[in-house]
Amino acid sequence: MPPGAKVPQAEIYKTSNLQGAVPTNSWESSILWNQYSLPIYAHPLTFKFKAEGIEVGKPALGGSGIAYFGAHKNDFTVGHSSVYTFPDARADKISDFAVDAVMASGSGSIKATLMKGSPYAYFVFTGGNPRIDFSGTPTVFYGDSGSQCLGVTINGVNYGLFAPSGSKWQGIGTGTITCILPAGKNYFSIAVLPDNTVSTLTYYKDYAYCFVTDTKVEWSYNETESTLTTTFTAEVSVKEGTNKGTILALYPHQWRNNPHILPLPYTYSTLRGIMKTIQGTSFKTVYRYHGILPNLPDKGTYDREALNRYINELALQADAPVAVDTYWFGKHLGKLSCALPIAEQLGNISAKDRFISFMKSSLEDWFTAKEGETAKLFYYDSNWGTLIGYPSSYGSDEELNDHHFHYGYFLHAAAQIALRDPQWASRDNWGAMVELLIKDIANWDRNDTRFPFLRNFDPYEGHSWASGHAGFADGNNQESSSEAINAWQAIILWGEATGNKTIRDLGIYLYTTEVEAVCNYWFDLYKDIFSPSYGHNYASMVWGGKYCHEIWWNGTNSEKHGINFLPITAASLYLGKDPNYIKQNYEEMLRECGTSQPPNWKDIQYMYYALYDPAAAKNMWNESIVPEDGESKAHTYHWICNLDSLGLPDFSVTADTPLYSVFNKNNIRTYVVYNASSSAKKVTFSDGKVMTVGPHSMAVSTGSESEVLAGDLNGDGKINSTDISLMKRYLLKQIVDLPVEDDIKAADINKDGKVNSTDMSILKRVILRNYPL
């Protein structure tokens, strides 16, 4: 560790049962960092640990202008009849979407189990009984001192209090109700109810004694169908009765267009919209994966001379990053990662070599720590189980903030190198270090206890969290959803480039799921999340207890919008799911700015607008615009002009390969596929289109024309020595036709309109795998 470097606090509020790396950056994380906790947003319930016990609440919704709130409020506190103040609260177990926390003093203790998406909370007591201190005197709409359960209303919210059979209640009619547990039974649960009918209370009582003991999420990518299936499972222990299930409340991104669930008639109004309930212990979601690309193709309506000039300008600045901390240095790597393919497309070998040389040497420098070195290194903190890069920024060291934002840029650069140099990316060289970065932010291997499972990603809420400690009254938060998605697309590229399907599928799970969540909770594309009183069509930040139109710095409204677009890469096409929304978002930004054009970040805004009207975006952009620090003139110009030529993303068509995109202009589709493997690949699209793509190359096909694989001179779908022999005979005029249909197109590998010795040279290099088609 560098001298003077900062690390997270030494104290972790956990019991000895919580072994291995500590989960951070989650909805429940404030338990681990604090003596008690700050509000915990499990939805539909919220909680807060304090000296007297555990506050329970169902937020009231309200707000306008800059923010809309669903803040925690204390409807009642679950306390202990024999312990009036506990010294602290400690995490005892954290599973995929639930947490057990223990409060103990002497022989008295409470263990609370809180689960994301559960209307229940479960408690186990030792040395005393449950004491419920209400924020006022509740109305009891069901039960008396001898009932097994009570139905109560407090602050307009209905709850069920569920005790073991044989229990007694004291204090009914006052603000404090104590449950006297029978001998040998130490469990107690509560549930927030959708209404105050006895039938609803009875239904919830049926599952109130099925205590959740574990939760798990599993995912599966079907390459043939281009679908992602995610299965959520809660294990339960039945304390009494014969029922073995529970009630689960699903977020809109989970129930929307989901034919695999049977919703109950019970719903909850929450900050995330309506949560629908199901009965059982498991459910699944199935999403379409719409593909990503490592870069857009060379099909733009650009002036190639101007584009090449922009590339040369950037090449001169390649070794001059804005700063050397993990975030800003990472953004510089991201800028070069997007420019590298453009240099290749232009045949600008000098710029290409300069970009890739700097990217390699920089990553190797960061991945190597020497005695006495003070900067550009990573340190593993074994107390928390995390990899910290130094120099750090924005609390990435002491608070473990934003690791997925920072490291995503490093991963993107590594993936771009891996697509070109598999040897560099091998585990014997630099690949193992790249995978450590992946594991820090999204460890998929439950057996690797050096890092927590999916640190930054919330499997149930479907998106990432940025704060390591979640130490805010509004819970955890995430501002730049697009930087999270940048990390996930980089994981897809890395997995595909290195042939590691486990890592690739991890990336597809994270990317696809977060895109769904962003469309719901940041953009409200379906118009059923944001309250009309909020007054905006977009959330700059999403918190556990609010969504808002503000950012972490004193930025312009262009920045407030653009922070959820950047970095724009060939995996950012998801932003174009609803072109009309893009127009609305852009126009709202201009109204807020009070200008006819964005005051700054013009390149980001025009790249975004190009997903609605690329021709207009092309007219708005000009080379005098100062790029955002993670962007370049070359990439902005290339992006806008490609969309001007290709059209908008077409999400109605999928393919049986992970690296693809489909575009549509004037009802004519263009299909783009990248094949990262070392052999030719046949790709079938859901509309029947078939393409054959050469190894380590990108192919583009428009309309229904048959796709010709450059270099495949005999039409067998492969590029090998047979094609070399055919090319030689063709050039020597020993044959006048090649076996493949459209022989000139197949033989003209550099697409200069001629078939000559240059094409032969390229073909040989392709076979030797040192030239990308």
UniProtKB/Swiss-Prot annotation:
Binding site for Ca(2+) 1: D365, E373
Protein name listed in UniProt: Glucan endo-1,3-beta-D-glucosidase
Residue positions binding Ca(2+) 6: D748, N750, D752, K754, D759
Subcellular location(s) of the protein: Secreted
List of residues binding Mg(2+) 2: K618, N619, W621
Region described as alpha/beta subdomain: 195-288
Entry binding sites for Ca(2+) 5: D748, I749, K754, D759
Alphabetized UniProt keyword annotations: Calcium, Carbohydrate metabolism, Cell wall biogenesis/degradation, Glycosidase, Hydrolase, Magnesium, Metal-binding, Polysaccharide degradation, Secreted
Domain GH81 as annotated: residue spans: 1-647
Native source species: Acetivibrio thermocellus (strain ATCC 27405 / DSM 1237 / JCM 9322 / NBRC 103400 / NCIMB 10682 / NRRL B-4536 / VPI 7372) (Clostridium thermocellum)
Lineage: Bacteria, Bacillati, Bacillota, Clostridia, Eubacteriales
